[in-house]
């Protein structure tokens, strides 16, 4: 690649993520069928970024704070170009995994139809849809889940799952489903900096850390797709 220029490079690579698919999601969040929450007045005056994924592959986006979003098929993500000083709030329609960067001074907020999720930096899976289904499983750290009506809230620790039953939040032990692997079998980056792409790829293979040849190259933006090959193939 040339070492200068800002133009987007379009490529398609094929990677085999199967045997290492779970690794990246040790620090991931899954949001499935989350209802669209309109930005409303909370984002007034802020420039909103809209990411839409209409393809079968997972669209991977890195937010301003370093959090990584794996956006599922037929899903849309809205977020401010610059987060507020005290919170990081995103709006999702569809499904996604989130790998949230820990920042105690900036709570990461996710809203669904009936509950609000507060994150400081942790790993968990969430399901929520228009029929009232809600399920959240924590893999690492702790998450607070609060009902929008009634004020009922619970703290969910690693290895625990919270579900919504008869308008009450219920805790239980987590059952591993291996669902996250389907999000990494075919992933795509759109206009992402090379350094952000390499951060995701390197997370898949901790023993093989790929680095760009220069800081200028790190800032080059790429559109690239990985499917059914190992991270070692990238190197």
Language-model features, listed with the residues they occupy:
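A residue-level detector for the "anchor" residue at the start of short, highly conserved motifs
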Residues: 5-20, 24-235
């Amino acid at each position: 690649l040339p070492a200068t220029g800002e133009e987007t490079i379009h490529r398609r690579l094929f990677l085999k993520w199967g045997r290492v698919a779970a690794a990246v999601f040790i620090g991931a969040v899954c949001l499935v069928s989350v209802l669209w929450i309109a930005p409303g007045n909370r984002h007034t005056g802020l420039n909103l970024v809209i990411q839409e994924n209409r393809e079968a592959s997972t669209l991977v986006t890195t937010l301003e704070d370093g959090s990584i979003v794996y956006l599922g098929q037929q899903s849309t993500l809205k977020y401010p170009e610059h987060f507020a000083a005290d919170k990081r709030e995103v709006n999702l329609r569809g499904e996604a995994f989130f790998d949230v960067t820990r920042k105690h001074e900036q709570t990461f907020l996710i809203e669904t139809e009936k509950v609000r999720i507060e994150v400081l930096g942790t790993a968990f899976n969430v399901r929520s849809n228009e029929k009232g289904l809600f399920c959240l499983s924590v893999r690492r750290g702790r998450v607070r889940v609060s009902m929008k009506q009634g004020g009922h809230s619970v703290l969910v620790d690693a290895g625990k799952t919270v579900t919504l039953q008869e308008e009450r939040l219920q805790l239980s032990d987590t059952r591993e489903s291996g669902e996250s692997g389907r999000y990494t079998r075919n992933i795509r980056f759109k206009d992402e900096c090379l350094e952000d792409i390499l951060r995701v790829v390197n997370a898949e293979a901790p023993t093989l850390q790929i680095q760009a040849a220069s800081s200028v190259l790190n800032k080059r933006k790429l559109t690239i797709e990985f499917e059914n090959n190992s991270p070692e193939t990238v190197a």
